[in-house]
Structure formats: C-alpha cells, structure tokens
Regions:
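Short, flexible coil/linker elements and helix-boundary hinge sites characteristic
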Residues: 74-75, 132, 157, 172
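Residues at the C-termini of beta-strands that transition into short coil/loop
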Residues: 2-5, 101-104, 164
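Signature aromatic-anchored transmembrane alpha helix within multi-pass, membrane-resident enzymes
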Residues: 1-26
C-alpha cells in the first residue's frame, strides 16, 4: 500500500504542477476561437485544430506560409536537411531528406565552451559531405540565426543565404567543398 500511496501522491503532484498550473505556457493567452483546420496544411492533419504561439492572432497566415514552404520544398529534389520545430514536415513531404528532430542552442548541440563542440561541428560537416547535402532549410522564425549556423555560414563563404518567405530560409551549399 505504501508504494501505491507514493504513486498516487506523485501522479497528483505532477499533474497539478505540470498540467493544471502550467497550462502549456505558450498558449495560455491564445484565443482558441481563432483556430483553423490543420487539414489545410495536409490531409494527414485532418481532425486537428491549428494555432501556435508564433501566429496567435493569425493562424491562417501561418498556414499559408507553411503551405508555401511545403510547395517550395517539394520542388527541391536535391538532397537537403530541414531544421524546424514543425516536426510534421518529415511525414508530409514525399521526398527523402535528413533532419534532426529538434534543434536548440546549448541543448541539441554542445555550447561553444564545451569540449565536444568542435567534434560535433566536424561530425555535422562530415555528414553534409558524406550525404552530398546541397541545401539546408530552416522553417521557423530565426532558426538560421542560432550561433551554430551563424558560425557555419561565417566560416564557409560558399554558403548563399536566401529568404524564401517569412518562415523559410535556405542555405545553398552547392558550391561548398567540405
């Protein structure tokens, strides 16, 4: 009974702490009456409502930008990497590409001061070369401005940066020799 009591207590404690009090902080002040059908992005998202903290007052604009991004990416048949917080892109695009799941400064990659930073950087560049990646695409505001990618762009003068829409940034690395 003691273990059962501990289980019930911890479940209740963490439910209140992380589910009720936190209320998904990013969406706490969002007007959910503005949600849009997520199937406007892709039929695989049917049954879901769409609203994010990035466009809380205009989810339709975000959907339009995501659709435009999806169309651009579908047209790029060359090998690419997509770095985004919109994790569904890997399932809605029919062409193959390599993508990390989620990318955060100091969490997904070691901080500059970390002894493994250089090893990670070399690993990343080696994978670009080995997989013959021609483009890096960033979907989401300021993803391309993370220090790792700023440094990558600054150190490799061959990188051509193109802003394709408000959400989609392209690093063209076809002229780079790694």
């Amino acid at each position: 009974y003691f273990i059962l009591a501990i289980f019930i207590f911890t479940t209740a404690k963490y439910h209140v702490r992380f589910n009720q009090n936190r209320k998904f902080i990013e969406l706490v002040n969002v007007d959910f009456s503005l949600t849009q059908n997520a199937s406007q992005i892709d039929k695989k998202l049917r049954g879901l409502k769409w609203i994010t903290p990035h466009y809380p007052n205009n989810p339709k604009k975000e959907i339009n930008l995501l659709n435009e991004s999806k169309n651009i990416l579908s047209g790029k048949k060359e090998d690419k990497i997509i770095i985004t917080d919109y994790q569904f892109f890997s399932s809605i695009l029919k062409n193959n590409f390599a993508s990390p799941n989620k990318w955060y400064d100091d969490l997904s990659i070691p901080p500059r001061e970390n002894k493994y930073y250089k090893a990670h950087k070399n690993f990343f560049i080696e994978k670009l070369s080995k997989n013959k990646v021609k483009y890096l695409f960033f979907i989401g505001k300021n993803k391309h401005e993370m220090y790792f990618f700023k440094e990558f762009s600054n150190e490799n003068n061959c990188v051509v940066t193109n802003k394709l829409n408000e959400l989609l940034i392209e690093f063209d690395i076809r002229k780079c020799e790694f």
